[in-house]
Amino acid sequence: MPEISHIRCILLSGPYADKDEPEIKACFPNGPKRTIGMVEVTLDNGVTGLGEGYLAVFAPLVFKSIVDLCRPQVLGKDGFDIERRVANLRSLCDYWSLQGAARHVISAFDIALHDAKAKSLGVPVHQLLGGPKKPYIPIYGSGGCCDTKEGFWSELDLLESLGIKRYKIRANKTDVLRTAWVMNEAGKRGISVGVDMCQNLADPPQAVNDVVTYIDAVHSKTDHRMLFIEEAIGPDCPKGFRELRQRTEV
């Protein structure tokens, strides 16, 4: 089987959003730009694969350093035995980063190896993962951090011009009127709205009852229905997610 002959870290930066947007002010102190980090794996058959790790958006040089640390662990080994390669990387990183930074990088290696293997075999990646369950996955526009109506209208204009019919906004449990207004404005354009409640960043996260109350309040003020709810409660609350599933149709 093809061996891993080369591993490269790729960092790409570019303009992102507007300097006055709330997301930039809150999350990007270096200004309106954003970096993505990728692992490029080259097999000895000449095929390359790419995988992205989200860590690089906020800490690109940390991402690069962990790639450098991981590189010797998999060089020269079978690039098709992806499960074993991930295990090699975990044996190096789990002691000090069972979750968090190293997991982002290991994920990038995992994706890159799947990409390279699929290209080598001449099949789409989903065939390596058991085949497709649906013929396609609709895309959505991720935004909704706006603090003005004009900001929302601008994002909706962009989505409409691209033919994108799904829109994700950020909102918290007190944003009932704001959420209903956005859903009505989007609905005029045939666009459905999903809501990211950002509870992965909350300590402590909100309760299930808060989420249900918010959904019911929003739905009482619009004829449209939320497409989905994301990060509704904290990531370490599996029982809460089960309860939420039982209490809402969203």
What role is predicted for each listed range?
Residues 1-45, 49, 54-55:
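Structured beta-strand/loop patches that form or line metal/cofactor-binding pockets in enzymes
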Residues 42-120:
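Metal- or metallocofactor-binding catalytic centers and their adjacent structured scaffolds
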Residues 96, 121-145:
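N-terminal small/glycine-rich loop or linker at the start of catalytic domains
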Residues 136-151, 170-172, 201-208:
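Active-site mouth loops of central-metabolism enzymes
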Residues 147-159, 207-216:
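Short, acidic/polar
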Residues 158-167:
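Catalytic domains of carbohydrate-active enzymes, especially glycoside hydrolases
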Residues 169, 176-250:
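Catalytic core of soluble alpha/beta enzymes
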